[in-house]
Amino acid sequence: MNPPAAFLAGRQNIGSEVEISTIEKQRKELQLLIGELKDRDKELNDMVAVHQQQLLSWEEDRQKVLTLEERCSKLEGELHKRTEIIRSLTKKVKALESNQMECQTALQKTQLQLQEMAQKATHSSLLSEDLEARNETLSNTLVELSAQVGQLQAREQALTTMIKLKDKDIIEAVNHIADCSGKFKMLEHALRDAKMAETCIVKEKQDYKQKLKALKIEVNKLKEDLNEKTTENNEQREEIIRLKQEKSCLHDELLFTVEREKRKDELLNIAKSKQERTNSELHNLRQIYVKQQSDLQFLNFNVENSQELIQMYDSKMEESKALDSSRDMCLSDLENNHPKVDIKREKNQKSLFKDQKFEAMLVQQNRSDKSSCDECKEKKQQIDTVFGEKSVITLSSIFTKDLVEKHNLPWSLGGKTQIEPENKITLCKIHTKSPKCHGTGVQNEGKQPSETPTLSDEKQWHDVSVYLGLTNCPSSKHPEKLDVECQDQMERSEISCCQKNEACLGESGMCDSKCCHPSNFIIEAPGHMSDVEWMSIFKPSKMQRIVRLKSGCTCSESICGTQHDSPASELIAIQDSHSLGSSKSALREDETESSSNKKNSPTSLLIYKDAPAFNEKASIVLPSQDDFSPTSKLQRLLAESRQMVTDLELSTLLPISHENLTGSATNKSEVPEESAQKNTFVSY
């Protein structure tokens, strides 16, 4: 066994041990971070409960303060009135004191007079006792006389009524007698002339007597009718008084009802004004939330840009060191195969290598999908002419202004956005030469450049896998085993790695398949959001984001010297949440088949079955969130703002449609099943 081969094998073992140790450390860190996140969630929940209690106590204190202020204002008014009363009373007291002094002098005089009067009072008391005895006797007599007077008055009233009735009868009789006397006189004057008509006059007399009797009977009846009508009038007066009282009561009730309606209208106006204020505050908070989201995204981009630029710088330094070490080790082989290589050529190679890196970065920023593989071919030809048999590894992650502008766009512009970055660069690894084609020297040259930059490649691959959620993917752990890998780093970083050997010109294969190209990935985001959807966002839920292929991935090529296939696996990055209504309709239109077993599973495991010739399985486990983000403080602030918005919306009692929430649980993440690749979903 050659010494460089043993050295390379030792380095591979060291690299695998380093990988295992780093993976274990990362797992421990992940577990610690998950524990910390759970503790912070508990603390946040406790803080929210305490905050709600404080708000309730603040409202109660505020009401108490308002009542106390009203009482204070009333008491101050009463104090002012009483102070004025006290002042007036003090003036009166002073006047009374002066009067009291005068009264004391008068008292002394009156006391002397009282002594004199007391003697007189003793005499008068004796007289008064005698007079009281007389008064008692007189009072008894007065009582008896008053009783007799009452009886006499009653008799007098009865007699007066009888006299009045008799007077009326007498008056009527007098009138009738006067008439009769006149008639008798006339008859006396006419007797002489009409003795013959006596019979007729007698008859008329009898008729008049009968009429008198009838008239007397009618008068008695009319008196009885008058008495009945007076009693009826008294009853009607009592009813009128009672109706007036009822009318006053009804009028008071009407006034009370009018006042109640006025107060209800005032309360409604107050409630409307409060609703408008809360709506305006909600609108402002939503704008603040959108601004914070955009700022957070921009900061995330800046952080990731800085991290990846640092990684680029470290990888370049490691590449330069690795190239120096590989050149020192391969000098003997190069001299045996190509003795005409000069030191000037190596210097030119260094300068051209650096220039071509920056040219490749600029070219890849401005080219589209179709020119990606052609670009790799052109670079391959240039490297063949310039470098000879030296292998070149270029690893670059490019961040452009277009990506930043795309991420700054608000999510609410469309229900489903298909993000196709302009900087579409595929990761292509060219075949190394198998040991059957050439000799041992060429074999060593092919192994050295493929194994020296393992550390830098692993770091880059690990960063890409963390961003895509592929930390547990076996392909991300061993990128050097695959010949062709066409992967995207979702919208942010894209890696191009072209590995080439001069001796293996006949069997070099390029990644011409377009199934794993970034244009075939669709990233679905929430669209226009209503009030109900704002509620579902502001609740502490998780966001769903799906990256999937437009069509089945068919890119797979064989490796010279190692019997392994690199089947293109579908990348699905899932961040768990209840998806919004606008994004659900877009999901249903694009995805034709969905598995019924994935309704309640928070994460999904995609197992891809390879061709039956090799019976190899590649499983990709996708984590829900990126736990390595350095912007935890901003995320906490966002969570607090979300909680505040939910509290406000719950206080305004906005309607929450349960249908959207239940529908989001059923239509979570859907993945098409392809019979050719035999994909199976395992939910856990």
Curated annotation (Swiss-Prot):
Signal peptide: none annotated. A motif (LXXLL motif 1) lies at residues 634-638. Highly expressed in adult testis. Expressed in both prostate epithelial and stromal cells, with predominant expression in epithelial cells (at protein level). Not detected in prostate by RT-PCR. Overexpressed in various cancers. One of its GO terms (molecular function) is nuclear estrogen receptor binding. Keywords: Coiled coil, Cytoplasm, Cytoplasmic vesicle, Disease variant, Nucleus, Repeat. The keyword NADP does not apply. Residues 11-160, 199-322 form a coiled coil. GO terms for cellular component: acrosomal vesicle; microtubule organizing center; nucleus. Interacts with ESR1 and ESR2 in the presence of estradiol/E2. The interaction with ESR2 recruits CCDC62 to ER target genes, including cyclin-D1/CCND1 AP-1 promoter. Interacts with GOPC. Nuclear receptor coactivator that can enhance preferentially estrogen receptors ESR1 and ESR2 transactivation. Also modulates progesterone/PGR, glucocorticoid/NR3C1 and androgen/AR receptors transactivation, although at lower level; little effect on vitamin D receptor/VDR. Required for normal spermiogenesis. It probably plays a role in acrosome formation. It is linked to Spermatogenic failure 67: An autosomal recessive male infertility disorder characterized by globozoospermia. Affected individuals have a normal sperm count, but spermatozoa are round-headed and lack the acrosome. In addition to pure globozoospermia, some patients have a mixture of acrosomeless spermatozoa and spermatozoa with small or detached acrosomes, which is defined as acrosomal hypoplasia. Contains 2 Leu-Xaa-Xaa-Leu-Leu (LXXLL) motifs. The first one is essential for the association with ESR1 and ESR2. This is Coiled-coil domain-containing protein 62. It comes from Homo sapiens. The gene is CCDC62.
